[in-house]
Every structure is written in structure tokens, then in C-alpha cells.
Amino acid sequence: KIQGYDIAGAVFPASNTSGDCYDFIPMLDDTIGIVVGDVCGHGMGSALITASARAYLRSITRYVSDPRVVLGELNDQIYPDLVDVGFITVSLGRLDPREHKLEYANAGNWPAYILNSRGNVIREIRTGGIPIGLKEEFELRPSEPALLEPGSIAVFLTDGIPEAMNASDQAFGIERMLSLIKTNRKASASEIVQKVREEVVSFLGNGD
């Protein structure tokens, strides 16, 4: 628990060996790391790489706080393991609950969104970095920290929900998800996550 903040997450796997993951990691100076990632491809190999990446991140964040540097260190350490596997898309936010500031770095993952207390998107954070494991040389562009006003909502995700397809080949879409969050913005974080899950399941029907 973080004083003044309500945080929740979930994975909606396509199989029991999903490559998606999330984590909340204690970082330096009483900040918290918010991690969302996806291993390209699925299967037991992807699940093992996901576990390895999580372990690396928890080790790196003991001595590094800048999200860009953290992801660079992750690439350095896990790149040899990914040569024959694929790559990982990862977004990492560093929340300072005292300053209400969110620093962010993105290695090929879906953008993060900041919604205000009225549920309107006031910022879409795109840093445009390449996924972890594609190249040995790795660098991310910086982004300005986001200041979180009272009632703000920060949304981290992979492409799984917006690109989920139903039996009619229609995508769930990011706008549908953001609209759903806006409608339920007064609910708790865990309730919002559950509502999104229910809507995605209902939307998919007999699709994938």
C-alpha cells in the first residue's frame, strides 16, 4: 500500500503460460516502480523469460532509480538470454508519492495514459524506445515527468486489451477501454481492473 494512492493490476492471459506481467517494486528514496511487460511469443520459454526479467528488475532497482537507466541495465543483463527467444516490451513508471510525480520510460510497450479527476486523458506518454533484447546497444529518449493531481488515474497496459479481437474481427480498442475507466473513475483501482476484465471477456465472446 502507498499512502494517498490506490494501485491495482492484473494479467488477462491468453493461456496458462502468458508472456504478460506486471509488478510493483520498491525503489530508492521511498518511491515505487510500476512495471508492465510482454514477452514476444508465448509458451513456457516466454514465461521463464518473464520471471527472469522480473528478477533482474528487482535487483537493478536496488541501486538505480532513473527508469531509463533501469531499462538500459535490464537490456544489458538479459540480452544474451533473448537472442533465440525474441524480445520484451516493457514500460516502467517511478512514482514519488510525496512529490506526486511520475517518471516514465517505455521500451516498445503501449503508451501510458494520465486521466484527470473528470476522467479525461490529459497526457499520453510515448517515449518511442525499442523493445528489450532487440539490440545490444540500447538507448531511450527522455520524457518529462507527469505531475499527478488529486483524483488522477495513471493507466499502464500492454497491447493485449486494445488489440483483443472478437469473433467479428473487431478490436476492443483503446478508446473503449479509456471510456470504461472514465465511467468507473470513482471506483477503487481493483474494481476498475475487474470491470475492464469483465468487459473484455464479454466483448470477446467466442473470439480470442
Located regions from the model:
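Non-catalytic regulatory/interaction regions at protein termini and inter-domain linkers
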Residues: 151, 175, 182-208
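Conserved short acidic donor-positioning loop in nucleotide-sugar-dependent glycosyltransferases
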Residues: 161
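Short, charged, low-complexity patches
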Residues: 46, 50, 64-67, 170, ...
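ABC-family ATPase nucleotide-binding domain "signature/switch" substructure
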Residues: 164
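Regular secondary-structure segments
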Residues: 58, 75, 178-185
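… and, occasionally, acidic/histidine-rich disordered N-termini of signaling adaptors
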Residues: 1-155, 198-208
